[in-house]
Amino acid sequence: MGRLFGTDGVRGLANGSLSPELALRVSGAAAQVLGRGKTRALALVGRDPRASGEMLEAAVTAGLTAAGVNVLSVGVLPTPAVAYLTGLYDACLGVMISASHNPMPDNGIKIFAAGGHKLDDAVEDRIEALVAADDPVRPTGAGIGRVLNASGARDHGLHIPDQYSVEGTHERYVEHLVEATGRDLSGLTVVVDCANGAAAEVGPAAYREAGATVIAINAEPDGLNINDGCGSTHLDQVRRAVVEHGADLGLAHDGDADRCLAVAADGSVVDGDAILAVLAIAMKESGELAQDTLVATVMSNLGLHLAMRAAGIAVRTTAVGDRYVLEELRAGGYTLGGEQSGHVVFPKYGTTGDGVLTGLKLMARMAQTGRSLADLAGVLTTVPQVLVNVPVSDKAAVAAAPDVREAVADAERELGDSGRILLRPSGTEQLVRVMVEATDPVKAEQLAADLAKLVASL
């Protein structure tokens, strides 16, 4: 068995590589590691609406309860909501069943530790070791975990706030988002593409509660249509809708709503780098940007670094994945970080990327300044970037192949100071990602094509 955990949990083809049996073993191992030594341990379980979620939730619940941990299901909610509620309800772990932006046939298991924090590598290694050993601890009798509702959880001595019920988790999360926004959004009209995913209910509700006029699209999940030509990886629909409705902006989420990309009134795309630039400058002005520092990943465009330098903001760089962004935020005491893909983390309000909160904060900046999104995003001039995703059978071996490393070194020498190259295995899919940035867009296209051709040949 290869490594189970990727950049963001365990993912695979539902009922294929991600089988119910594997889901049971992973959740049982997680319960042993994260629930060890805790009496009346509680796990929260949520999911996105893809069809396989119900099957995998049943398997995860079986694994957790078989390990002696009680389970509280919060139903279909965004990943950041599950993380937030894990902390709010004082659970020893939370589980989100989702493959995020991946196609519907895939699914995944994201695990949060107490407080809603993502797992570090050492904890993942301990869970993987238990899965590989396949010798689970199995209590009997009263030691078996129970599947609880809110009142039942309180009857078992678990910490579920009296004013909240499982049925009210959506409302509580929306309240949390609106409180964090801190500004009335009346007068702004937004098109929200919910990707037929976990944001379909809470996304439009939060934007409306904050005062905005909301036009929701792709907000009718049926289990099969999640991410199907919509959401943050397919922006054509939201771009058209913004122009057709004369909206001030559009916001696009992915299947589990932990990311957000934006569209200006003219239909132009505002990516995660531009969103980070706008929010970092806003927080610097308000004194909320700790140490005048933004945390970004190696995938962020060179243009972000140049824009932040001009604004007097330092940039700390991490590996790809919002878990690594969060680790750097916590280690340095910083207050804003994120990725070009639209994961933005506000550690004051949550422990993972939150797409809906990102959209609310972006709109709050528009309301505060009275400026259009295109005007605000103009602070960043993107250096031409080409990203090619190359399907391969063994992503780690191909990315580390001597021929590939030599070709990358040659291309870097050719670019000199006028660009950069990043070639890495995807953390979530069987792909090698080839990214080339260069002030000469023709040069960027050619180098990316040459490297992608080499990768595909191996």
From Swiss-Prot:
Q: Which residues bind Mg(2+)?
A: S100, D254, D256, D258
Molecular function GO labels? magnesium ion binding; phosphoglucosamine mutase activity; phosphomannomutase activity
Q: Which UniProt keywords apply?
A: Isomerase, Magnesium, Metal-binding, Phosphoprotein
* Gene coding for it: glmM
Cellular compartments per GO CC: cytosol
SUPFAM superfamilies this protein is in?
A: Phosphoglucomutase, C-terminal domain, Phosphoglucomutase, first 3 domains
The domain of life for this entry's organism is: Bacteria
Question: Which species?
Answer: Nocardia farcinica (strain IFM 10152)
> What name does the UniProt record give this protein?
Phosphoglucosamine mutase
The UniProt record lists the EC number as 5.4.2.10
Q: Which family does it belong to?
A: Belongs to the phosphohexose mutase family.
The UniProt PTM text for this protein says:
Activated by phosphorylation.
Q: What does this protein do?
A: Catalyzes the conversion of glucosamine-6-phosphate to glucosamine-1-phosphate.
Its recorded reaction(s) are: alpha-D-glucosamine 1-phosphate = D-glucosamine 6-phosphate
Q: Which residues form the active site?
A: S100
Cofactor annotation: Mg(2+)
Task: Cite a single Pfam family from the UniProt record.
Answer: PGM_PMM_IV
Q: Per its UniProt entry, what is the enzyme's top EC class, as one word? A: isomerase
In terms of InterPro entries, this protein maps to: A-D-PHexomutase_a/b/a-I (IPR005844), A-D-PHexomutase_a/b/a-I/II/III (IPR016055), A-D-PHexomutase_a/b/a-II (IPR005845), A-D-PHexomutase_a/b/a-III (IPR005846), A-D-PHexomutase_C (IPR005843), A-D-PHexomutase_C_sf (IPR036900), A-D-PHexomutase_CS (IPR016066), Alpha-D-phosphohexomutase_SF (IPR005841)
> How does the cofactor bind to this protein, according to its record?
Binds 1 Mg(2+) ion per subunit.
A biological process term (GO) from this entry: carbohydrate metabolic process
Residues bearing PTM Phosphoserine: S100
